[in-house]
Amino acid sequence: YKPLDQYSLKHRRIMTEINVQAPLDLIQQSLPFMFEANEGWIINLSSGSKRHPSGPPYDLGGVKGVYGFYGATKAMLDRLTTALASELADKHIRVNTVEPKAAVLSEGADAVVGDMLTSSQIESIEAMVESILFLAHCKPEHTGRNEISLDVIDQQNLTVMDLEGHEPHRGGKSS
C-alpha cells in the first residue's frame, strides 16, 4: 500500500492482474463445467477499501490514500461480479463477492500491518470461511450481491467454529 503517485505502471498492472484479471480468467475456465451442471457458485473476495472515503477533511486513520489503487481494483471486481450475476442468473449460477468487516490477519497481512491493529480491528479467518461456505450453498436468487462477512453470519444466524470444527470462534486472531 502506498499513495497513488508512488505506484509504478508495473505495480499497477500486477495488482490489476491479481485482483481482476486472474479471478475473471478462473471464472471463464470454470463456466463450461457450471453450464454442463446447470448450476454453480462463484465467490469473489473483495475489500472495504473499495468504498469512497467521506470528506474533506479525510479521516483515513492515518493511512492517507494508500488504499486507493488496491480499492479501485476491488471496486472493479465487484462490478464484474454484478455483471456476471446478471448474465448467468438464468443458468442457475450464483455470483457474489464477500469482504471482511474487519481486517483478516492472514500471514501476509500480519507481516505488513499486524503490529498496527488491535484485536477489535481483526476478523478471524474462520468468520470469512463461514460466510464463504454460506455463499457456496445459497439459493439461486442469492446472486449479484456484495456481502460483508460478519453481516452474512448475523443475518443467516451462522455459528463460526474454529478450523477444526470446535468451539465457536468469531473475531480476533486465529488460534
Predicted regions and their residues:
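Conserved Rossmann-fold SDR core element
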Residues: D78, T82, L88-P100, P140-E147
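Conserved catalytic Lys-bearing alpha helix of Rossmann-like short-chain dehydrogenase/reductases
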Residues: V20-P23, F69, T73-T81, V95, ...
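Catalytic Tyr-X3-Lys loop
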Residues: D5-D25, E39, I43, L77
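A short, exposed helix-loop element centered on a Lys and neighboring polar residues
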Residues: I27-Q28, T82
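C-terminal helical subdomain
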Residues: T97, D115-S175
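A short helix-coil junction within the Rossmann-fold of NAD(P)-dependent oxidoreductases
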Residues: K2-P3, Q29-W41, H52
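Catalytic loop of short-chain dehydrogenase/reductase
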Residues: W41-M76, T81-A89, A102
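Conserved mid-core segment of classical short-chain dehydrogenase/reductases
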Residues: Y1-R13, S54-G62
